[in-house]
Amino acid sequence: MSVSVKRISTGTQVVAALPASEDPVEFPAEYFAKNPGKIPVFISTRLDLDKLRQYVYMGLTTGEVNVCHINSYLYRVLQNIEDEARDNWVSFRVTIAAKDTTVRLFDMLEVKEYAGLVPDGKENANLTQTVDEWLPMYILGLQRVGRATDERYRGDLYDHLCAQCKLKSPSFESLGNPADNNYASWINDSNFLKLVAAIDMFFHHFKKHEEAVIRFGTITSRFKDCAALSTMAHLVKVTGMPVEEVMTWVLNKPVEDEVCRMMTPGQEIDKADSYMPYLIDFGLSTKSPYSSVKNPCFHFWGQLTAVLVNSARARNARVPDDIPYQELTQAALLFAYATGRSSDLAQRFVLHNKEYIKAAPDASDNSEREESKEAPTTRDVVEWLAWWDDIGQVRTRDMEVFARRAVHGILDPREKSIGAYARGYFA
């Protein structure tokens, strides 16, 4: 919808427009509306498991493994893992399993034959089935290691992976060097990513399954590119407020718009066994509506609020580019200050019927508080906005002291992080 402004000198209307520089987001429900049914994945089933085991093992050893061999091997060796559905497992009207029936690992997918060329690989006739005890976990762990950008962290992940594989099977042997990072050619393959998502989805549903330890390598698939949703969940934790109350503290138009888009109904955000958390790896969306990239104002406001209420985790969140920092900073400080000055302390249990009854508020006390412009002691956003207007929407000295105290412990923060921004702004 175009908007016009009036040119004063001539009285003519001028259309105000900006270039459409961003691709629109894609919601998971939209995918299933266009593509009802299980998610297709293309796997070659022409090679037997013995050959695939050799091709994958030798390919990882030489750094020349073929993604078709990886996909076929994972499917072959894991396809018979199963459990019993305690309830109907349905997502976006797709029935994955009926109650009290056996569900297999890849039942959320529709497996189709891969029609492309599948090359031969290097053989090793000495390999036995004992390799299958650890090789799938090793492969899936390598894709997690390969996504790590920090060299030290990548090395630590690889060490943890090897330790997990060794626990799973004493016959484990490392087949490569994490520094080589030869996994980029296959960790971005769409069929491989669908297998990764399916494996994590199954074992997230059946957390107590004896093979669930394999999630070490797949867990990053869940809620990939959903950092803004994680920010919302983190805000709920650090403020102690329910999500609906947190939303009443949204005071900026850009944040409002982003929250409304994230809360688009029918997307199964709060359904734990849904396809939704895997919207990227399942190919349901190429532009996540829940990423920090698409919700930069909400992400910044939420993480800055968390920093100001002393969340160590929020300090390392990255500062987005080109957002209204000043406006968002004011809103975050007011929210954090209200959280810090109030509490939800109340007697929850009684002994011998000794219950504290709070006295009714005195009208004279309220009028005195209004005259002195004392800050509220509740978390009611209406009371706080009234107070904010009363003081002329200018930070008080106590608010500044509160902020300085919150950032005092931030030492050597990461460059371009929320922690670095907060320390530079408030210290």
From Swiss-Prot:
Coiled-coil stretches: none
Quaternary context: Homomultimerizes to form the nucleocapsid. Binds to viral genomic RNA; this interaction contributes to the virion assembly. N in the nucleocapsid interacts (via C-terminus) with the P protein (via C-terminus); this interaction allows to package the L polymerase in the virion and positions the polymerase on the template, since P acts as a bridge between N and L. N(0) interacts with the P protein; this interaction prevents the uncontrolled aggregation of N(0). Interacts with the matrix protein (inner layer); this interaction contributes to the virion assembly. Interacts with the L polymerase.
Main location: virion
Location(s), subcellular: Virion; Host cytoplasm
Keywords attached to this entry: Capsid protein, Helical capsid protein, Host cytoplasm, Ribonucleoprotein, RNA-binding, Viral nucleoprotein, Virion
Signal peptide span: none
A Pfam entry, by short name: Rhabdo_ncap
Function according to Swiss-Prot or TrEMBL: Encapsidates the genome in a ratio of one N per nine ribonucleotides, protecting it from nucleases. The encapsidated genomic RNA is termed the NC and serves as template for transcription and replication. The nucleocapsid is bullet-shaped with the tip containing 8 turns of a conical spiral before reaching the helical cylindrical trunk. Nucleocapsid assembly is concomitant with replication, therefore viral replication depends on the intracellular concentration of free N, termed N(0). All replicative products are resistant to nucleases.
Location of the region described as Interaction with the phosphoprotein in the Swiss-Prot/TrEMBL record: 351-396
Family: Belongs to the vesiculovirus nucleocapsid protein family.
Taxonomic superkingdom: Viruses
Entries under SUPFAM superfamilies matching the protein: Rhabdovirus nucleoprotein-like
Entry protein name: Nucleoprotein
Residues that, per the record, bind RNA: R144, Y153, K207, R215, K287, R318, R414
GO molecular function, one term: RNA binding
GN (gene name): N
